[in-house]
């Protein structure tokens, strides 16, 4: 049996003609929000466009959607997915007098209050916080972080139902409208703000393909979002962003109801001790892999490339290790939203992911997934797992899946084949969703269905093979494994074949 250590001792990091299978998500900002730049980003490796709804107007986000679709007209290439990242429930400070930034020395004592009369008149003596229940949930001795942890305060006393007495633990400046984190404290904020609800309705109206749901704490939060998306948004995939201790604690229940997960390490690294983040990342990714749910690794992956043309060695290792952990997607934030080198950042991420994929011990990984998956599995999963096993034995170059909904494609991706998964579908939305799953290369078949089912199967299969040749996945004489159904529609994938191109 192949071992992980044995695989690594023989590691060949020459990628040759291999194609990257990890998807790349890029946040679009003013510097990249035009069709021409989006085309270049896609050529560099971008698969999913992210809109950050913490910033920008509806007019701006509409322009991102329009430009993303225009880029596909200019450069058809592979289908491009569009994701809406919600602002989510959050806690913020009030407005300082004249918007002045007040210096705070260490051991400075002051008041945090939820009294609305201070909302627009904060200073270095009294700071308004917009979370009304903060005095009910926090305890003496707890730490409060302001501005992503730039300032830390210890709670000295819960004075009354509106007032906390706090002491600064370090020097800094207290400013208007900064984020507030309460590490180790369970908060009872609503799953969605009114802004979030409006944003989701905007996303449904504009046909976004996925929602990155911020600050998910319970499974109920996902169900609330699904309710807001409604019938018109029933096909939108919900990706739960795990950003706090509550989300980690309730992860198993969240995983059951979400379509996928994002390990959002920014706020997570504030809410839990930073040294624990890498371990939590590995645990969450492993659970997603076993469940067959897509998982995204995000935040500061190539942060230095916001202003520098080359990444740090630690950043390259971070991207590579996220791929080795089992992430389906890796994400760029400021690097592509406001950075000086957005295209280079995507290229760097693509090149790093490609090399990292050569380091994955595919057979041991497959064995782990098969052994740990509860039996019996549904027919479609049994076929998917068998297809991946067949690629190892037959030395196949690709798995071609004729798919309607994309679910069988998801299951094939779960078992981490060492070859591309070529998805042929008539469903353009399913083709875009599948970028959430590692290794999937989608092609939309636009021809009407043939009268004879077998003729239609062969036509779609030939289409997938020809497109794969164009992309460099297949050549004449290559062996492929195919999955198809015995009838049209969803849920009939039960036939596996081994063919020669």
From Swiss-Prot:
Protein name: Pyruvate kinase
Binding, Mg(2+): 243, 267
Residues that bind ATP: 52-55, 92, 178
InterPro entries tied to this protein: Pyr_Knase (IPR001697), Pyrv/PenolPyrv_kinase-like_dom (IPR015813), Pyrv_kinase-like_dom_sf (IPR040442), Pyrv_Knase-like_insert_dom_sf (IPR011037), Pyrv_Knase_AS (IPR018209), Pyrv_Knase_brl (IPR015793), Pyrv_Knase_C (IPR015795), Pyrv_Knase_C_sf (IPR036918)
Residues at which K(+) binds: 52, 54, 85-86
Cofactor: Mg(2+); K(+)
Gene that this polypeptide is encoded by: PYK1
Keywords per UniProt: ATP-binding, Glycolysis, Kinase, Magnesium, Metal-binding, Nucleotide-binding, Potassium, Pyruvate, Transferase
Pfam families: PK, PK_C
CDD domains with a match to the protein in the record: Pyruvate_Kinase
Binding site for substrate: 50, 266-267, 299
One GO cellular component term noted in the UniProt record for this chain: cytoplasm
Associated pathway: Carbohydrate degradation; glycolysis; pyruvate from D-glyceraldehyde 3-phosphate: step 5/5
Gene Ontology molecular functions: ATP binding; kinase activity; magnesium ion binding; potassium ion binding; pyruvate kinase activity
Residue pairs linked by disulfide bridges in the UniProt entry: none
Any one Gene Ontology BP term: glycolytic process
Site description Transition state stabilizer, residues in chain: 241
Assembly description: Homotetramer.
Native organism: Eremothecium gossypii (strain ATCC 10895 / CBS 109.51 / FGSC 9923 / NRRL Y-1056)
Keyword Kinase: yes
Gene3D superfamilies registered for this protein in UniProt: Phosphoenolpyruvate-binding domains, PK beta-barrel domain-like, Pyruvate kinase, C-terminal domain
Family as reported in the entry's similarity comment: Belongs to the pyruvate kinase family.
């Amino acid at each position: 049996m192949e071992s992980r250590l044995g695989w690594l001792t023989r590691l060949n990091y020459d990628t040759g003609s291999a194609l990257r299978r990890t998807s790349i998500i890029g946040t679009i900002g003013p510097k990249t929000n035009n069709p021409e730049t989006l085309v270049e980003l896609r050529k560099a490796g971008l698969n999913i466009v992210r809109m950050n709804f913490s910033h920008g107007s509806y007019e701006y986000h509409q322009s991102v959607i329009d430009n993303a679709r225009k880029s596909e007209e200019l450069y058809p290439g592979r289908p491009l997915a569009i994701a809406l990242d919600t602002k989510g429930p959050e806690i913020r400070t009030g407005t300082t007098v004249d918007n002045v930034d007040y210096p705070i020395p260490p051991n400075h004592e002051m008041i945090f209050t939820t009294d609305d009369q201070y909302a627009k008149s904060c200073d270095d003596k009294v700071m308004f916080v917009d979370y009304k229940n903060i005095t009910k949930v926090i305890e003496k001795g707890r730490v409060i972080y302001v501005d992503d942890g730039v300032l830390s305060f210890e709670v000295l006393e819960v004075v009354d139902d509106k007032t906390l007495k706090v002491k600064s633990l370090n020097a800094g400046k207290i400013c208007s409208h900064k984020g507030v984190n309460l590490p180790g404290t369970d908060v009872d904020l609503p799953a969605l703000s009114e802004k979030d609800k409006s944003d989701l309705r905007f996303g449904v109206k504009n046909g976004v393909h996925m929602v990155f749901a911020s600050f998910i704490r319970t499974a109920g939060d996902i169900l609330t979002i699904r309710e807001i998306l409604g019938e018109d948004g029933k096909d939108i995939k919900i990706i739960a962003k795990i950003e706090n201790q509550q989300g980690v604690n309730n992860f198993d229940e969240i995983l059951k109801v979400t379509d996928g997960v994002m390990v959002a390490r920014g706020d997570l690294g504030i809410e839990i001790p930073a040294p624990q983040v890498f371990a939590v990342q590995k645990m969450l990714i492993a659970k997603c892999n076993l469940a067959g749910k897509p998982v995204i690794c995000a935040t500061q992956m190539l942060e230095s490339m916001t202003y520098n043309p080359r990444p740090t060695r630690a950043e390259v290792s971070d991207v590579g290790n996220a791929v080795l952990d089992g992430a389906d997607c890796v994400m760029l934030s400021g690097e592509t939203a406001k950075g000086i080198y957005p295209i280079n950042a995507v290229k760097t991420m693509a090149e790093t992911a490609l090399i990292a994929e050569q380091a994955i011990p595919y057979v041991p990984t497959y064995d782990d997934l098969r052994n740990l998956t509860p039996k019996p599995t549904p027919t479609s999963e049994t076929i998917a797992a068998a297809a991946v096993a067949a690629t190892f034995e037959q030395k196949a170059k690709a798995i071609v899946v004729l798919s309607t909904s994309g679910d069988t494609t998801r299951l094939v991706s779960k078992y981490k084949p060492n070859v591309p998964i070529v998805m042929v579908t008539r469903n353009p939305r399913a083709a875009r969703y599948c970028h959430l799953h590692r290794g999937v290369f989608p092609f939309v078949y636009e021809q009407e269905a043939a009268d004879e089912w077998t003729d239609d199967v062969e036509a779609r299969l030939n289409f997938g093979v020809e497109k794969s040749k164009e992309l460099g996945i297949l050549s004449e004489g290559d062996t492929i494994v195919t999955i198809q159904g015995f009838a049209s529609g969803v849920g009939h994938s039960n036939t596996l074949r081994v063919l020669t191109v």
